[in-house]
């Protein structure tokens, strides 16, 4: 039987074995990692909401769309850099593998420095542009500036963990994320409660925890991963490899940001509905993410699976992986909907404490509406990440346009027609528009590749 896992290193060959089993085995650490990541984000929300106040919670919530757009660009780009790494690993091309790894690291350094400086300078004007309520603006600016200054730490973790996942190792990024999650919670309590650092303390805790997890992933890569030996010959700047990385990575970043522009438009609409709507949607969205981010983890597993099998020329395994991925997402969506139905009031109370009834009821309404349509997001993650894993990241940008349209439509409905209900349906509208396009493109691409084979 062919060896599929390198002993000691944790890397895995996803081009062999039953697709459903391989995807589940690879996705499980990603899902657990996402849950723990959301756990510390959830705890962070509770600490901010209860120890500082609902205005502070709303201030952090108003930064979500900008965070989604700017930091999301960086994260998606790092994920894109992992696709050529997965392809060269699947094709057993060690020279290409080393050159992609080195050139990807160089691009990450440049990108992180440019974004950290540029976004910090424009943070306040951007928050004013989206009509952040005056009573929330000061805290929002303080919070997001620290997050933006910490972009290099974010890039370090995301690129190093993406590289490990591209080599088939999803376990160790999970272990290190687990460490950083507990560290983040401890630092939150320390900075906010006894030290009284407010929202700045929450932001600093996030940056420090990401830096620690990035250092741990990098250490593991250089000391434990086998068959990686950088030399003067393969550790060089390469135009061909840099262009390939940029061709896949930056469009994935743009796709995320284009989608996030819709979130910015939606946030503008929420802000116009007032601070009560802002606090309600912020609490509901935090709880929603706790249930749906595992779907994105399954999508990330699909991207690595597709990348390795595409590199090995196994289109048949790509098709089977899509089918099995959809089965996983449909089952999880049903379970998540039931769970939200059972715990939504308890979860909202946990986040908001003794908040006024209008905020509490708004958060519950948000969860009630959006949970029914979780399956749209689950399928979108399968088809979008398949498109990216196949290397068609430029075409995937258009799916971000679909999300932009959906969120913009929801924001318009909120302000002009449906009120807060329009906010509740904005994300499902975005998922539906993007899903239609991604299904069409994946079907078309696989037919094209089957004919070429």
Which residue stretches match the model-derived regions?
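Short runs within selected transmembrane alpha-helices of multi-pass transporters and secretion channels
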Residues: 78, 146-165, 173-181, 202-217, ...
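Residue-level signal for short hydrophobic patches within transmembrane helices
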Residues: 16, 20-39, 43, 66, ...
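Helix-terminus/linker motif at the lipid-water interface of multi-pass membrane proteins
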Residues: 35, 39-57, 127-134, 190-197, ...
């Amino acid at each position: 039987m062919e060896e599929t896992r390198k002993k000691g290193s944790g890397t895995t060959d996803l081009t062999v074995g039953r697709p459903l089993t391989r995807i589940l085995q690879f996705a499980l650490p990603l899902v657990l990692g996402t849950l723990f990541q959301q756990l510390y984000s959830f705890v962070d929300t509770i600490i901010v909401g209860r120890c500082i106040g609902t205005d502070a919670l709303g201030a952090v919530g108003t930064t979500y769309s900008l965070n989604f757009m700017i930091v999301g660009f960086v994260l998606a780009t790092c994920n894109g850099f992992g696709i050529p790494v997965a392809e060269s690993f699947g094709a057993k091309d060690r020279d290409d593998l080393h050159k992609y790894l080195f050139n990807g690291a160089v691009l990450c350094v440049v990108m992180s420095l440019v974004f950290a400086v540029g976004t910090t300078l424009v943070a306040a004007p951007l928050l004013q542009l989206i009509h952040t309520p005056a009573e929330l603006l000061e805290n929002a600016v303080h919070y997001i500036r620290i997050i933006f200054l910490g972009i290099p730490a974010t890039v370090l973790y995301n690129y190093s963990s993406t590289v490990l996942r591209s080599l088939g190792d999803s376990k160790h990024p999970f272990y290190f994320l687990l460490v950083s999650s507990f560290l983040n919670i401890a630092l939150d309590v320390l900075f906010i409660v006894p030290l009284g650092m407010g929202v700045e303390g929450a932001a600093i805790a996030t940056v420090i925890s990401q830096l620690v997890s990035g250092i741990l992933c990098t250490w593991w890569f250089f000391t434990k991963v086998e068959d990686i030996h950088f030399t003067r010959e393969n550790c060089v700047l390469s135009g061909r490899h840099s262009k390939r990385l940029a061709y896949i990575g930056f469009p994935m970043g743009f796709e995320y940001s284009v989608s996030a522009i819709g979130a910015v438009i939606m946030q503008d609409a929420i802000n116009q509905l007032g601070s009560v709507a802002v606090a309600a949607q912020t609490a509901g969205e935090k709880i929603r993410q706790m249930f749906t981010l595992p779907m994105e983890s399954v999508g990330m597993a699909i991207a690595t699976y597709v990348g390795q099998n595409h590199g090995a020329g196994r289109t048949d395994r790509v098709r089977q992986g899509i089918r099995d991925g959809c089965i996983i997402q449909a089952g999880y969506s049903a379970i998540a909907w039931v769970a939200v139905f059972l715990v939504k009031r308890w979860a909202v109370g946990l986040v908001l404490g003794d908040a006024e009834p209008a905020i509490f009821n708004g958060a519950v309404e948000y969860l009630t509406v959006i949970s029914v349509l979780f399956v749209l997001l689950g399928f979108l993650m399968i088809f979008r990440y398949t498109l990216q894993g196949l290397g068609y990241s430029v075409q995937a940008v258009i799916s971000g346009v679909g999300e932009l349209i959906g969120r913009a439509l929801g924001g318009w409905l909120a302000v002009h027609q449906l009120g807060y209900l329009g906010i509740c349906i904005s994300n499902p509208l975005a998922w539906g528009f993007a899903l239609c396009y991604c299904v069409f493109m994946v079907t078309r691409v696989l037919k094209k590749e089957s004919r070429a084979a």
